[in-house]
Amino acid sequence: MAGCARRRAACPLTRIIASCVGGPSGICAGQAWECESEIDIVRYQRAKTGALFAACTMAGAASSGYEPLGWQKLGFAIGEAFQVADDLRDVAGSAEKLGKPVHQDEANQRPNFVAELGFDGAMGHFEDLLAEAMAAIPPCPGQEQLGQQITGVSRSLVSGLSSRTAAA
């Protein structure tokens, strides 16, 4: 009987993850868009990184007894913010600090926010997304601490980056 109960509890989580990462609006679609000549960068990143983060926030909410859809906007906002930070780090970070090669978006002709908005525009978009994420945290125990944690981790991703280092 315990096995059946665990399987029933896992079904909503499986549906959440599948809806966020599969099909025409999930990560598979986002990956396929890389082959297109023109891409809506927000839709593209929402389908990729945003979908992964939304799956995490929604699955976590469902596992904790909260309505998953109430956490979707938060996931999309922090996912897109993470992607913008990654794009900024790709042009202004160092391979030594990041532990991975830099300038890969340009070399592989991948859509990215820095190419679309410029360095300063991408940094402004990052700040807007962080504010959007803070506003999207549903009421819950630990809401303030969650906001502080998201802000701290997010800001650490872009700490020390500037348009001067991007131009170097």
Annotate each language-model stretch with its function.
Residues 1-168:
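All-alpha prenyltransferase/terpene-synthase fold signal
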